[in-house]
Amino acid sequence: MAEKIKIGTMWLGGCSGCHLSIADFHEKIIDVMEHADFEFSPVLMDTKYDEIPELDVVIIEGGIVNDENREFAEELREKAKFVISYGTCAVYGGIPGLRNLWDKDEVIEEAYINSITTPNEEGVIPSEDVPHLEGRVKPLGEVIDVDFEVPGCPPRSDVAAEAVMALLTGEEIELPETNLCEVCPREKPPEGLAMDFIKRQFEVGKPEDDLCLIPQGLICMGPATVSICGAECPSIAIPCRGCYGPTARVEDQGAKMISAIASDYKVEEDKTVDPEEVAEQLDDIVGTFYTFTLPAALIPMKIQKEGK
């Protein structure tokens, strides 16, 4: 019998949800275990961080949030022959990346001094026992070389299991490259996706059956999101939030979404609605269009003016 492949997993700046998707491989985990042994996984096994063995493959969840994350990422890159960036936090920075809208010191002050849920009358900032924050959250691939990326918050277990099995058996790994709209069952109106207004989900109530959510006033990130999920959320009338990130052809998910909406206003047809008025209805543009991918955007953080 051929020697089994040695697999490890690690979480960095993530929530462990991606590890739960690995646990949700269900019976497919049996197929994986026929080809591989899990040698290291602080989340799924009772292993210590200082016992990282030599690995054939390591699956890393989470982006680079603090100096400890960076150190582990660099060591895992040295110990593993093949690195998989697993989940949207690892691939794009994820929701923790919205921290990039503030300076590091502002974040620390808000967490330990200003927060009403953290009694700290003496104003003590933990320093010795708490890893130091990086200047900004970064995707894993910005710190170490990554061999393969599996986005998702968390990745679909069936898709992830197929990708891991393909890797273990030497088959070619293929993930979808189309955007979500191309597989969504909802119909796009012939006049385009122009929005006369923007509404929150509770304001719309139950959306019209089978009609695209965008012309109904709901921000759906489908035009700027890769179709790995199979359009599960829009299929049940829940707008896509973009948790799988953009397609391989798109460099900036938020910019792509803004472009997709703006280019469909059909101003040349004397549309009466001013696009700027619609945009003003968005309370949080960055939080809406870059929920999961700000650290990987063309501008990955708030630009600080000199002297501020």
UniProtKB/Swiss-Prot annotation:
GO terms for molecular function: iron-sulfur cluster binding; oxidoreductase activity. SUPFAM superfamilies: HydA/Nqo6-like (SSF56770). Keywords: Oxidoreductase. Its EC number is 1.12.99.-. The keyword Cell membrane does not apply. Disulfide bonds: none annotated. InterPro entries: Hydrogenase_assoc-protein, NADH_UbQ_OxRdtase-like_20kDa, NiFe_Hase_small_N_sf. It is an enzyme of class 1 (oxidoreductase). The keyword Ribosomal protein does not apply. Part of a complex that provides reducing equivalents for heterodisulfide reductase. Belongs to the [NiFe]/[NiFeSe] hydrogenase small subunit family. The F420-non-reducing hydrogenase is composed of three subunits; MvhA, MvhD and MvhG. It forms a complex with the heterodisulfide reductase (hdr). This is F420-non-reducing hydrogenase subunit G. It comes from Methanothermobacter thermautotrophicus (strain ATCC 29096 / DSM 1053 / JCM 10044 / NBRC 100330 / Delta H).
